[in-house]
């Protein structure tokens, strides 16, 4: 379970304070798939980075499986797999296999465990023939597949994805959606941000809407549709902004 308790994050820029996330609270049960919606600059990435322990909250706390992320960072990091859009975390001069071996070692996997995981992930994503190619020389879609494999190499319980289908072709994007379905069946907790409303509707049990750092909705899609008496998610999102609603 992930508990977000009254979390805020402020940045200082040219003597001004930027309130990226403001007093956000919600809970994500274990094994749930959550879609994070909001316009550019809404605070989605900042919130994901705080859950991932990359950033610390200015105020409030984040609890993952009963452990405070600010106090047990390394233990929490081993539970989490992270992919932030085009920030693949890969090394261009290394092959796909060398990249995956490197990250497997960082997470404490044995050589045998690493090889088994790499073989399984390569088969899963159809990239076996690319394992010995340098990452800098493969297509964007294949690079994203390697990045997703890197995210899953240590078999994390919590998976955080920021705009994961951005720049992917239709085949690769559909592969990602299938992956989410499989990970959900495995009991993984998944939080991903997206601008594609249909993608969120197809994959998520729960959605979180953020506008200018404020939480404007957290709950199931069905509850939201019943409240708004429409299933047009774009319309609902804009209507809540216009009405100035907060959760």
Name these PLM-found stretches.
Residues 155:
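Conserved catalytic motifs of ABC-family nucleotide-binding domains
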Residues 1-4, 10-23, 73:
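A short, flexible loop at the N-terminus of ABC-type nucleotide-binding domains that lies
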Residues 159-163:
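Catalytic Walker B motif of ABC-type/P-loop ATPase nucleotide-binding domains
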Residues 101, 105, 112-130:
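Conserved ABC ATPase "signature" region
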Residues 60-70, 76:
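Conserved ABC transporter NBD signature motif
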């Amino acid at each position: 379970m992930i508990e977000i308790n009254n979390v805020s994050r402020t940045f200082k820029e040219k003597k001004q304070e930027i309130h990226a996330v403001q007093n956000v609270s919600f809970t994500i049960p274990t094994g749930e798939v959550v879609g994070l919606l909001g316009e550019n600059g809404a605070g989605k990435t900042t919130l994901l980075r705080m859950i991932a322990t990359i950033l610390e909250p200015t105020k409030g706390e984040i609890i993952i499986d009963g452990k405070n992320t600010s106090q047990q960072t390394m233990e929490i990091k081993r539970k989490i797999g992270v992919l932030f859009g085009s920030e693949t975390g890969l090394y261009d001069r290394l092959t796909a296999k060398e990249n995956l071996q490197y990250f497997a070692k960082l997470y404490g996997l044995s050589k045998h465990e690493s090889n088994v995981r790499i073989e399984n992930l390569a088969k899963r994503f159809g990239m076996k023939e690319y394992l010995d190619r340098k990452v800098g020389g493969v297509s964007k879609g294949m690079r994203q597949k390697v990045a997703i494999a890197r995210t899953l190499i240590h078999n994390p319980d919590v998976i955080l994805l920021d705009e994961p289908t951005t720049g992917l072709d239709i085949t690769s994007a559909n592969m990602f959606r299938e992956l989410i379905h499989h990970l959900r069946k495995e009991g993984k907790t998944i939080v991903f941000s997206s601008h594609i409303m249909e993608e969120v509707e197809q994959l998520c049990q729960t959605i979180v809407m953020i506008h200018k750092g404020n939480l404007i909705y957290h709950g199931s899609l069905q509850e939201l549709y019943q409240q708004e008496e429409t299933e047009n998610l774009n319309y609902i999102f804009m209507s809540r902004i216009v009405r100035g609603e907060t959760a």
